[in-house]
């Protein structure tokens, strides 16, 4: 049989691409090939590359979260180192939302405390400058302690005595952390001159331009008027050694005391909020977080035992000046800083408040102030409910509860005093 000649060249060049056999005998270098010309199997390095990319993205996201968290910490530190319950609540929620551990929190907090900008702000505060605004001064006061509840019946206001403002000679910057040893309550009103304020004395309203206008009374340098806080930079070197019988002076912060003033021979409640280790003085705040708030810097050891009453345990501080009395140890200096609230009188919430010790027999009004218990309970529950509670928050919660206990004991004692006084009056009648 005759064989017809084939037009084919005898190779697979005439076959379709999908039927061609790769040269080199067997499979090609890239492995098996699909009909579309792509390899059926990806190289083993491809999944690893995708995992590395995902891990890198996660790291970048967490870095952004840490930057956001440290920015909030820096902002709070710039406002003031006394952290309120509200700010701590914000910080706790941020740590949850941004997935930050306690170790990362401590690391970032350490970076904030060592930040050059924050350090300059602290030095500015310590150097004796004023707060940038009234809002910041109010924030520091509220951060120290929650606002106490005050009986509305005691808020009887007296007419204020207008006093012309005097320009402040110079201003210097200020700030600091935690318990600011300088004066944290100074506000924009600190640019004014001295504002004399006398407790327990009634004043007639004096109008500007009146011929009967009296000049501000002169007060000797060793006894400035009630309700004023003198300049943090005294004109003479102040001794920083205050005998506290081996007790840490900062342990008095948050304690409540009652001090007697010679103007009306009456005791007034105050809270110890700050300590200045340079001068050895503590800040006493009266009517805290109210329009009539006043404060002063004193050396507790120099107050006569008969002029101070401790609510709770008495630390037994010695009196170096043999009972010379309250008012001899206040900070002196050429420039006065009026209290927050544009110089309202200290006795605006205590009009008519008298004790039976001067023999007048007038009724003594009850003045009890304690923290809002429901707010306090909520904050303590928030600390206890957290998964890993911060030891600092737990310690602070314990301290606040102890202070609240002291306040309740003092309130019960006041109720007992009032009840005894009323019973004695009824017996005399």
UniProtKB/Swiss-Prot annotation:
InterPro entries: EMSY-LIKE_plant, ENT_dom, ENT_dom-like_sf. The keyword Cell membrane does not apply. The modification Phosphoserine is found at residue 419. Residues 1-44, 146-251 are annotated as: Disordered. Disruption phenotype: Reduced resistance to Hyaloperonospora arabidopsidis isolate Hiks1. CDD domains: Tudor_Agenet_AtEML-like. Residues 57-144 form the ENT domain. A motif (Nuclear localization signal 1) lies at residues 190-197. Keywords: Coiled coil, Nucleus, Phosphoprotein, Plant defense, Repeat. Residues 23-34 have a biased composition (Gly residues). SMART domains: ENT. Residues 48-113, 393-415 form a coiled coil. Residues 166-179 have a biased composition (Low complexity). One of its GO terms (cellular component) is nucleus. It is found in: Nucleus. GO terms for biological process: defense response to fungus. Pfam families: ENT (PF03735). A motif (Nuclear localization signal 2) lies at residues 349-356. Probably involved in the regulation of chromatin states. Contributes to RPP7-mediated and basal immunity, especially against Hyaloperonospora arabidopsidis isolate Hiks1. This is Protein EMSY-LIKE 4. It comes from Arabidopsis thaliana (Mouse-ear cress). The gene is EML4.
């Amino acid at each position: 049989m005759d064989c017809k000649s084939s037009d084919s060249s005898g190779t697979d060049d005439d076959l379709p691409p999908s039927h061609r056999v790769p040269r080199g005998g067997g499979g090609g270098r890239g492995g098996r090939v699909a009909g579309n010309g792509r390899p059926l199997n990806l190289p083993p390095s491809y999944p690893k590359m995708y995992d590395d990319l995902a891990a890198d993205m996660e790291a970048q996201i967490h870095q952004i979260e840490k930057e956001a968290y440290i920015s909030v910490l820096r902002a709070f530190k710039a406002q003031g180192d006394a952290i309120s319950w509200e700010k701590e609540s914000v910080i706790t929620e941020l740590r949850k939302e941004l997935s930050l551990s306690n170790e990362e929190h401590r690391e970032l907090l350490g970076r904030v405390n060592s930040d050059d900008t924050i350090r300059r702000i602290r030095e500015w505060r310590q150097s004796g400058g004023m707060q940038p605004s009234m809002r910041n001064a109010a924030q520091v006061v509220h951060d120290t302690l929650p606002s106490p509840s005050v009986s509305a019946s005691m808020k009887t206001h007296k007419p204020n005595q207008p006093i012309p403002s005097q320009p402040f000679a110079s201003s210097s910057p200020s700030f600091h952390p935690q318990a600011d040893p300088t004066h944290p309550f100074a506000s924009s009103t600190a640019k004014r001159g001295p504002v004399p304020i006398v407790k327990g004395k009634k004043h007639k309203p004096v109008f500007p331009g009146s011929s009967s206008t009296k000049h501000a009374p002169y007060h000797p340098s060793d006894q400035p008027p009630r309700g004023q806080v003198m300049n943090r930079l005294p004109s003479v070197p102040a001794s920083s050694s205050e005998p506290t019988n081996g007790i840490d002076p900062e342990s008095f912060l948050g304690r409540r005391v009652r001090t007697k003033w010679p103007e009306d021979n009456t005791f007034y409640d105050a809270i110890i909020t700050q300590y200045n280790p340079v001068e050895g003085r503590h800040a006493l705040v009266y009517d805290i977080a109210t329009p009539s708030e006043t404060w002063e810097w004193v050396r507790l050891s120099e107050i006569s035992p008969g002029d101070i009453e401790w609510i709770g345990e008495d630390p037994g501080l010695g009196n170096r000046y043999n009972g010379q009395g309250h008012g001899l140890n206040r900070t002196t200096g050429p420039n006065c800083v009026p209290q927050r609230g544009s110089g309202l009188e200290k006795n605006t919430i205590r009009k008519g408040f008298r004790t039976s010790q001067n023999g007048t027999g007038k009724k003594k009004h009850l003045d009890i102030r304690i923290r809002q218990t429901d707010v306090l309970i909520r904050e303590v529950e928030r600390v206890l409910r957290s998964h890993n509670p911060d030891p600092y928050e737990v310690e602070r919660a314990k301290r606040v509860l102890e202070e609240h206990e002291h306040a309740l004991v003092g309130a019960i004692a006041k109720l007992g005093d009032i009840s005894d006084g009323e019973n004695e009056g009824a017996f005399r009648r």
